[in-house]
Amino acid sequence: MKYQRVKGTQDYGVEKAFLKDAVESLFLKEVRLHGFEYVELPTLEHAQLFRSTVAQSDIGNKEMYEFLDKSQRELCLRPEMTANFVRAFVQNKWHAASAENKYAYVGKVFRYERPQKGRYREFTQAGVEFVGKADFFKDLYVITLVLRLLAKLHIKYTLKLNYISNKETRKKYEETLHKYLLEYKDQLSESSQKRLETGNVFRVLDDKEDSQKDFVKNAPKLSDFYSEEDKEYVKNIKRGLDTYHGLEYQFDEQVVRGLDYYDDLVFEVSIKDSKAAQDVIIGGGRYSNLIKDLEGPETSSIGFAMGVDRVVDYLMDQEVYKEHLDKLETAHSENEYYFWAHPEASYKLNFFVWFFNLQLNEHISSSLLFDYDSPNRNKAFEKAKKLNSKAFVTLEEDNSLTVYDFKYGTKKDADLKEQYHHLDFTSLLDSRHFDNLFDSNLFKPSPKELMCMCSAFRNRFGDSKALLKFAKQFHYSEDDVYFSDQKIKKSKWKSAKS
């Protein structure tokens, strides 16, 4: 008998397996830089776990690999990893260690789907879970991790987000949506008609076929049902995302994600300009009831899962990985900087935005951690020391910035009130902690970025000698350096040298 691989599975040859390993290694490296700790979870679970958590989704209805073991227990191969993680989180009381918990995992997932390119019955997910009190800062933090991963993988992407509020708001909305869609029932696909009958009306919005129909696009909007608190949350998310120059994103009310436990913010990342049917490579969102529903503490979490196989397929097709594979293998980071903001600081959002932009700067490979939950500086300070951080960066109640340099045992202060509108390299420079906060050999700015930095440097200090010393940190010659739109004359360099 000639044996074939099981339908929906893959054989990874040497080259593809090597690339898959590189992608997973990069993922683990980046999540650890963001303070997430790696855990491993079992592939086998009790089937009831997923029946109770994703019952209304296609996963819970028809895609699970279920079976009875020899003791007649109903088991399954996990179809997704969030419920898998939450079960472990609750059972092992991981929540007892801290109010703020960040975890990462990589593992095989199994779904009985119709196989096609980008959709397999056995595939690998890499994901994170940031457990703790709901906070839009944490949402932005997780999104920065997603964007940094995409930059490291050299993937051009489309980021879509939506805010689906809480159960109470959605219930009111779904009643209105159900009434509206009933008028068009005959024009819906068979699967969407079943969703109407079972009360899973929300899923009609992201149905591949029906979502493209005009009457679905013109359906009542969930945003019309937002509370003032919901509107403020969305506003803060948009403010945070808008500060990152060059970031393109869309708020799309048809993005609802397919799992029952999501609420508040949801998002997905697809490959830009892709013609593939399965182009979503990352999906995630916040869930505020799942942990409690599985008999854990009443707390929230935000996370995402990356489809490793889809990423690998895309990189193989584009062959861009060949140019960057050595960077995936050799990228490393040594230093950690721990950030904390006083709860009452009026510039807390600005401080986080500064941190947010540093996180997304692909030239900075240092580990930057933000403490969201410590109520005072002393507790945050002890955490920073425990993590062997190189420096502790704080925003005080009066909006002053303080940098504690553990390596040299120094402390420096600066008032950043007037500098918060600078959100690129200039903000680093204006903080006057550039050489202490970041080692100059960690990155080399582009000429355009250097022009911006030199302009700010000259305006602030007016010192040619300091400017020359500053530029030489990045191994630039005199002819490379600009301020405003003019080259610095060599005569100035000569006078600065003397």
UniProtKB/Swiss-Prot annotation:
EC number: 6.1.1.21
Molecular function via GO: ATP binding; histidine-tRNA ligase activity
Enzymatic class: ligase
UniProt entry tagged with the keyword Secreted: no
Record key words, sorted: Aminoacyl-tRNA synthetase, ATP-binding, Cytoplasm, Ligase, Nucleotide-binding, Protein biosynthesis
Entry keyword annotation includes ATP-binding: yes
Any one Gene Ontology cellular component term annotated for this protein: cytoplasm
Compartment(s) where it occurs, according to its Swiss-Prot or TrEMBL record: Cytoplasm
Record field: catalytic activity: tRNA(His) + L-histidine + ATP = L-histidyl-tRNA(His) + AMP + diphosphate + H(+)
Domain of life according to the entry: Bacteria
InterPro entries in the record: aa-tRNA-synth_II, aa-tRNA-synth_II/BPL/LPL, His-tRNA-ligase, HisRS-like_core, HisRS/HisZ
GO process annotations (BP): histidyl-tRNA aminoacylation
Major subcellular site: cytoplasm
Assembly and oligomerization: Homodimer.
Family (UniProt): Belongs to the class-II aminoacyl-tRNA synthetase family.
Name of the featured protein: Histidine--tRNA ligase
